Amino acid sequence: MSESGPQTGAITHTEPETQFDELDVDTPLVGIIMGSKSDMPEMEKAGEILAEKGIHFEVRVMSAHREPDTVADYCRNARMRGLRVIIAGAGLSAALPGVAAAHSDLPVIGVPLSSRLSAMGGLDAILSIVQMPPGVPVACVGLDNARNAGHLAARILSG
């Protein structure tokens, strides 16, 4: 194997549009998004963990089903705005984490959320997040466990 350059199948790295060192100290590094305002009580827990660790974050409510263009625009522009990780919480069919991953090269952490409307007790949300097609990775924490999403985001940022 030649050491003169990338080989077939080699992974190459390109610099992001915004350099980490150039970011304002108050620039959010983590975007916390959720499909509905009713998801806020659980998803706020990710923010609490990030705040404890001194990590700036932003919170948005946007539905992959009702506002697909909003989700796509948010995720496409996330890196340019300084985000480094996206935490996406959703219940039922839980499309939001996968849609976020499809529109961003940032790490996406999916938080499956239980719902009184679910006939499967949240298993539907878990399976929707973990069963992604090749090339669209989403990390998944436990059901209703946004705290672990906050911890995982912090670990990703520390690496």
Task: Please provide the spans of the model-predicted regions.
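Short glycine/serine/threonine-rich phosphate/pyrophosphate-binding segments
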Residues: 39-44, 67-71, 92-99, 119-120, ...
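Short, glycine-/small-residue-rich phosphate/pyrophosphate-handling segment
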Residues: 117-159
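Glycine-rich phosphate-binding loop
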Residues: 74-113
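Glycine-rich phosphate/diphosphate-binding loop of Rossmann-like nucleotide-binding domains
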Residues: 25-66
